[in-house]
Amino acid sequence: CRVMVTARAEGRHASQPRRDIATLKLARSLCRLGDGYLRPHAIPTMRAALRTIAAAQSSYAAQRVDAILEQGRVDEAMVAAGLDPEGVRRMRPLFYDTAAVTSLAAGNPESINVIPANALAYIDGRILPDQTRQGFIDLVHSHLGNDVQVDVFREQYSAGLESSFDAPIFGVIEEVVADRCDGAKVIPWQCAGSTDAKHLIPRGLPVFGFIPSKPLPPGMNEAGAHANNERIWLENVPFALEVLYDIVTRFCLRA
């Protein structure tokens, strides 16, 4: 849910600064976002993920994680599940509605001696499946305060989506992975990015973002996104093809 934040005030000559100019109103409001992690919540998929990770230690660890999540202490639950600081950092966005300030606009460098009447900020928001459009706007507004206006930017809103891991296809994925990877367990997971699921799930089609891949060799960085590190290891291509073929074949034969 991408939003635009607008601060307004009287514009005037820069020789007369004030505390209530638009740029300062906006700056003060944005600081209230803190680190951008706005609302903690464990959706069913990520509850199952933490429970599965913790269960690798013991059944007690899994029960303890469940108890901590019931109290809404998601950061503590990740640590209790056994994640190291880097693991917590990477997993944390999947337990929060988040807001990242990505662009600012105010005034004109050619008129640097003029205090602008408007100042704008653009926020890329990522919302969990239980959040709504208005709910997120209200959440952002509650952090920013009343000095600014918050609007959805160019109608760029997509609901958070989640497929049930109780679906039959998920069971086949678990079975094939266990067969081909020495009994490895599949951990349900949520994606913090935007995918074609937003077009398919509303039409009743469950979507699972599953890309089979072996661990990368020591010293090789994992793939990233939107840069020259958005890649796949070539030796994983035939492995992925074989696993996916096996999954589709088994699933269709049982249908």
Segments from the language model and where they lie:
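Short beta-strand/turn micro-motifs at beta-sheet edges
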Residues: 108-113, 216
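Active-site-adjacent substrate-binding region
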Residues: 30-39, 60-63, 164-214
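Hydrophobic beta-strand positions in extracellular immunoglobulin-like domains
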Residues: 7, 125-127
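Acidic-enriched catalytic cores of C-N bond-cleaving enzymes acting on peptides and small amides
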Residues: 1-4, 14-104, 114, 129-150
